[in-house]
Amino acid sequence: MRKLRGGQTRETRKQKQERREENQKIQQQLKTIVLPICGVVFLCIVAYVFLKTRPRFEEL
């Protein structure tokens, strides 16, 4: 059993299970929300740099 912060009481099985479920939920949100957003931001930065650094041909 794990000691909770600031007290002598210990975690019950139910509390431990709830904590594990909460951690799994956070990991799932990381995969479904945070990583795609980071990917989109990265692609936007790459596209911006590409468009700003490509050679331009001026017609006479």
UniProtKB/Swiss-Prot annotation:
Basic and acidic residues: bias regions: 8-22
Highest taxon above the source species: Eukaryota
Chief subcellular location: membrane
GO CC annotation, single: membrane
Transmembrane segments: 30-50
The keyword Transmembrane helix belongs to this UniProt entry's keyword annotation: yes
A Pfam short name: DUF4519
Coiled-coil stretches: 8-34
Swiss-Prot/TrEMBL keywords: Coiled coil, Membrane, Transmembrane, Transmembrane helix
Membrane topology qualifier: Single-pass membrane protein
Region (Disordered): 1-22
Keyword Cell membrane: no
Subcellular localization: Membrane
Family as reported in the entry's similarity comment: Belongs to the SMCO4 family.
Stated name of the protein: Single-pass membrane and coiled-coil domain-containing protein 4 homolog
Organism the protein comes from: Culex quinquefasciatus (Southern house mosquito)
Lineage: Eukaryota, Metazoa, Ecdysozoa, Arthropoda, Hexapoda
